[in-house]
Amino acid sequence: MHTLEFQLQEEYIELFKLIKLLDLVDSGAQAKLIVGDGYVRRNGEVETRKRAKIVSGDVLEVGEEVTITIKAR
């Protein structure tokens, strides 16, 4: 599993935007699909809200391939 850290520039970032920003998918539409299909876990729980507000301290798992830790700015 690959581990990434993401430092927030604002108070939060929407989940699908973060996935796209980190180039884990080719498009925003693909990001929305993997979230909607339940491939993303947030703090151990499946997160299907595409626009969920991701904040400092959250830990995301995208599939079984990537773990992302969110840090404050």
Where are the regions that the model predicts?
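C-terminal structural segments of small proteins and small subunits
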Residues: R49-R73
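A detector for short, charged/polar N-terminal pre-domain segments
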Residues: M1-I13
